[in-house]
Every structure is written in structure tokens, then in C-alpha cells.
Regions:
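Conserved RNA-binding domains used in RNP assembly and mRNA/RNA metabolism
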Residues: 1-158
């Protein structure tokens, strides 16, 4: 019955898994999150109580273990929403090398108190996933797959 259905927002995503597969599909987030706005994918993935997330890919549906997600890439409105939250942050170009030899490049949006505004402070304070802003995209990188972070010069874009 639809009256018992929990309202959800459909968010198109591209996900890289730790086995090397890339899935294009739809994640579902709450229509109303903290502050009354729609829940964004970053906060959804950083929730600690849920270990699995549902993903719909065409006619197939998966339950993905968050621990096996290397990154989630957003485009369009969901990416603009997250990037919009970072307008007042200090933007630091970064190249993130991941386990398996993949690199992603973009901008870290650091919104921290002045005494903790270094990149290392930001990385150590991040949740399970951290946002990397790109041109028209936001890539949510799982911290446990990060090997190195350095200046954003010379990497291929995801």
C-alpha cells in the first residue's frame, strides 16, 4: 500500500566497487533529511548504522556493502547541491591515489576552524566518504581506499 511507503528521492550515480566493476544506477535517499532539506548521498553513505545500500541498475537491483564501494560519482542536481554547500570553504586542488592504482583529481572543499584548516586535519576529520569536487561532478571517495593525497596536478579525471 502506497500510504505506508516511505518517500524516497532517486539519485543517479556511478559507483566503482573494490572488485573493479563500475555500476551506473540509482540510489535512494530520504526526501527530508537534517535541516528539512532532501538527504544528500554523502550524508547517506556516512551514516554509520547502515552497512548496506540498495542500488537499482535497470531491471537489476543490488544490496551493496558500503565497505566495498571505492567511490560514488554524482552529476547534475545532486552534484550541484553538494558543491553549493562548499561555496564558503577553502578550495584545495588534490590528486587522490587509490588502492589498485587509480587516481582521481578534483578539489577538496575544506570548511574547518582556522586552527584545523590543513588538508591533513580535513582528512582526519572526514567521515567514511569524503567529497572531491570536479567539473560538474562530485566524487565521494571512501577514505579506506585512499593511499596518497597530493597536489592536483597531472592526474586523469574520473
Amino acid at each position: 500500500m502506497d500510504i505506508y511507503r516511505i518517500p524516497r528521492r532517486e539519485v543517479p550515480v556511478r559507483i566503482l566497487l573494490d572488485d573493479g566493476r563500475t555500476l551506473d544506477g540509482t540510489l535512494f535517499t530520504a526526501e527530508t533529511g537534517p535541516g528539512g532539506r532532501p538527504e544528500d548521498v554523502l550524508h547517506y553513505l556516512n551514516e554509520s548504522e547502515e552497512g548496506f545500500v540498495p542500488l537499482v541498475c535497470g531491471r537489476d537491483s543490488f544490496l551493496l556493502n558500503k565497505a566495498g564501494i571505492v567511490w560514488v560519482q554524482l552529476a547534475g542536481d545532486p552534484a550541484r547541491e553538494l558543491a553549493g554547500e562548499a561555496l564558503d570553504a577553502r578550495h584545495v586542488p588534490a590528486r587522490i591515489s587509490l588502492a589498485g592504482g587509480i587516481s582521481v583529481v578534483g578539489t577538496l572543499a575544506i570548511a574547518m576552524p582556522p586552527e584545523r584548516s590543513r588538508v591533513i586535519d580535513f582528512l582526519n576529520a572526514a567521515g567514511r566518504f569524503l567529497p572531491l569536487l570536479g567539473e560538474g561532478t562530485v566524487t565521494l571517495v571512501q577514505c579506506r581506499f585512499v593511499v596518497t593525497v597530493r597536489s592536483g596536478q597531472g592526474a586523469e579525471r574520473v
